[in-house]
Design a protein with these regions (language model features):
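Extended, charged alpha-beta segments that form solvent-exposed binding/catalytic grooves
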Residues: 104-196
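Generic recognition of stable, solvent-exposed alpha-helical segments in well-folded globular domains
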Residues: 21, 25, 29, 137-144, ...
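Extracellular structured ligand-interaction cores
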Residues: 100-102, 123-127, 205-207, 247-249
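A glycine-rich phosphate-binding loop feature that marks nucleotide/adenosyl-phosphate handling sites
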Residues: 47-51, 165-172, 322-326
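A general structural signal for short secondary-structure junctions and capping/turn motifs
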Residues: 68-70, 92-98, 118-120, 169-170, ...
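Class II aminoacyl-tRNA synthetase-like tRNA-binding/catalytic domains
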Residues: 2-119, 127-131
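A generic secondary-structure signal for well-formed alpha-helical elements
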Residues: 34-42, 149-160, 311
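A translation/RNA-centric and nucleic-acid-associated enzymatic feature enriched
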Residues: 109, 179-337
Length: 337
């Protein structure tokens, strides 16, 4: 069963068809601005990968992929959780050089997702990746890229508010980004849970970037789980915006500079899975075949929620919901797609 909260007095700013029209515009406008800012080229991506290839994203390490047999190949395949590792391999395959990158529409099924206003089992995002140099593996370069993404989000919002006057006086994004590490966040709010820390900081600043996610903090616990074999835990981040309709932080993007060989070995050991180094993808990384990269995912439904002031992800995407959620939305005038 999902957990749902409908704000008192909530009303969608746009009707059902205008919502669909706006979703289409957001996806077109933002992708163009993102590609221009980060020098990305659009490519086609897989919906599934071979089990055991090491290409699927293990997320927090406990989520089960949707798997199925392929009799013609005598193999098992998995629906992707994300394309974090596939994109890096693709950049190697295409022979891209530093400064060049790719973007794709990623559609995934996350069967173990806990459903609520922001989460469904269907995930749609722009997955992007670009080749970088060793000198660019710094927090400063990470922050420069965050600014580029936030600028693209705000510019998209500006165009949308011009096309839909109903949004003009109701949607306001903060262009200034407040950066903080997870350790600084824990030091600042020692008695809060990680989610409470994110909400407190985002409510104060509007647009925030939380850096260095995955490693253990002074408390002995990580801020959040991250797979050990794509992001470098010292060079990654989440971008969050304060979302007034739900009075909470809305995570729009998880991104980072990817592991090099040293970081991969270190993080596999820390995660207790050093044997993963024997998988095909990991061997290519460890022997220096794969390029140094950075990348991330930007939620398409999340961006639509943010720019349209929506209270439930089901207002901007089609997914599956339990009867109680459907009834609660119907009673509150929330139109699920």
């Amino acid at each position: 069963m999902s957990h749902i909260t409908i704000p008192e007095g909530y009303q969608s700013l746009l009707g059902l068809y205008d919502t669909q029209k706006a979703i289409g515009l957001i996806k077109t406008i933002f992708q163009e601005k993102l590609c221009m800012a980060l020098h990305l080229k659009r490519v086609t991506a897989p919906l599934f990968v071979m089990q055991g290839s090491g290409l699927n994203d293990d997320l927090n390490g406990v989520e089960r992929p949707v798997a199925f047999d392929v009799p013609s190949l005598n193999e098992q395949a998995e629906v992707v959780h994300s394309l974090a590792k596939w994109k890096r391999y693709a950049l190697y395959k295409y022979g891209f050089r530093p400064g060049q990158g790719i973007v794709t529409d990623m559609n995934a099924v996350r069967r173990d997702e806990e459903l609520d206003n922001l989460h469904s089992i269907y995930v749609d995002q722009w997955d992007w990746e670009r080749v970088i140099t060793a000198d660019q593996r710094t927090l400063e370069f990470l922050q420069e890229t965050v600014w580029d993404i936030v600028d693209a989000v705000c510019a998209t919002s500006d165009e949308l508010r011009w096309k839909f006057p109903e949004l003009k006086n109701n949607i306001h994004l903060d262009r200034e980004v407040a950066f903080i590490t997870t350790q600084e966040l824990e030091d600042r709010y020692p008695d809060f849970t990680p989610k409470q820390r994110e909400n407190a900081f985002a409510k104060e600043h509007g647009t925030v970037c939380i850096m260095q996610i995955g490693g253990r903090l002074k408390s002995g616990q990580p801020h959040d789980g991250r797979a050990p074999d794509y992001d470098d835990w010292t060079l990654n981040c989440d971008i969050l915006f304060w979302h007034k309709p739900l009075d909470c932080a809305l995570e729009l993007s998880s991104m980072g500079i990817r592991v090099d060989a040293d970081a991969l070995r270190r993080q596999l050991d820390a995660a207790g899975c050093p044997k993963r180094a024997e998988l095909p993808f990991h061997k290519l990384l460890l022997d220096g075949t794969l390029p140094l990269t950075m990348g991330g995912g930007i939620g398409q439904s999340r961006l639509c929620m943010l720019l349209l002031g929506k209270a439930h992800v089901g207002e901007v995407q089609v997914s599956l919901w339990d009867d109680a959620t459907v009834q609660a939305c119907r009673n509150s005038g929330v139109e699920l797609l």
